[in-house]
Amino acid sequence: DCKPLRDGVQELRIDHGPGYRVYLSRQGAVLVLLLCGSDKGSQSREIARAIDYLSDWKERGRP
């Protein structure tokens, strides 16, 4: 189950245990994994962190 969030970040939900989340971004043919292992309790904080990671990745000039 994958859904778009904001600023190019998507959330992949894994229905196991506490409901893990993986944050990712599709940049053309590249799949960028931003953060793995978040659960519902830390979701908003981890989304903000994933957005920061994606911004940093783009600033570094990655494709």
Task: Give the label of every model feature segment.
Residues 17-21, 25-63:
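Enriched for short, Lys/Arg-rich terminal
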Residues 1-16, 61-62:
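A short, surface-exposed loop/turn module that caps and links secondary-structure elements
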